[in-house]
Structure formats: C-alpha cells, structure tokens
Amino acid sequence: MKIVVDADACPVKGIIERLAKEHQIEVIMFIDTSHELYSDYSKIITVSKAPDAVDFALLNQTSPNDIVVTQDYGVAAMALGKKAKALHPSGKIFTNDNINQMLFERHIAKEQRRHGKQNLHSKNNKKRTTGDDIHFESSLNELLKSISS
C-alpha cells in the first residue's frame, strides 16, 4: 500500500506526509513542470504539462489498496476501478456508491457553464478552514486503518 497524490494544487500535502511517516507508508506526489515541490519523505514525480499528464502518470502507479488523494472526480473514479481508495482533500471519501452521482453533477455543471448559465464553481469556492484539515486527517486515518486491518 502507498499513498499517491495529485499534488499540483493539493492543500494537504503536509498532513499526508505526517500521517504516512507515522504509519511508515510510501508517498508518491505527482506534479507537472509548472510546479516545484521538494520533500524529504515523499517521492516526487514531475511530468509534462500536457492535459491530464499528471492524472495518467498517477493512475499508472496506482495499485489495489493504494490511497489516491485527488480533487478530480474522474481520477477518483478510475482509482476506484483499480480497487484503490480515493480521497478528496476536503476529507470526502470517494466510494463506488457516491462517485456516479458526483460525476453526473460535474457533467451538469459543465453543461450549464457551456450554455452560459451560472458558474456553479464560483459560489462554492470557500476558503479552506482548520476544520477541513481536521476532516481530511480523520478520513485519511480511517482509510489507513481499514486497509491495514
């Protein structure tokens, strides 16, 4: 088991590394060439800035029972298809029971934006809080315990 992270805009890299160290779990963080990231613990893989390059590199390194941290519902769905666990930086655990609804809602929002309707992203962009970090940490701990038991 390892933790693989879509690290380009991931706000919880520090929490991931701290918990991974405590549980002695490998972490691989994926970024594109427009970002720089250094770590004394995690392996950093830098890929081209091509569309979805980070997503495909991350998924190529994902195995069953890995934990994938991503904000991308499509990546989460593919990770679940590979029998991995998937976790949003908000702490929401993606499951086979909720991913289809999330993908459908993403599709509807995209269609509304395409037709010039209200941008649903802008009104939901709240600043990250300490509570968000606590929720993420709790969810990651939950996944780590479920996999190791």
Curated annotation (Swiss-Prot):
Coiled coil: none annotated. Residues 112-132 are annotated as: Disordered. It comes from Lachnoclostridium phytofermentans (strain ATCC 700394 / DSM 18823 / ISDg) (Clostridium phytofermentans). This is UPF0178 protein Cphy_3042. Residues 112-128 have a biased composition (Basic residues). InterPro entries: UPF0178. Transmembrane segments: none annotated. NCBIfam families: PRK00124.1. The lineage of its organism: Bacteria, Bacillati, Bacillota, Clostridia, Lachnospirales. Belongs to the UPF0178 family.
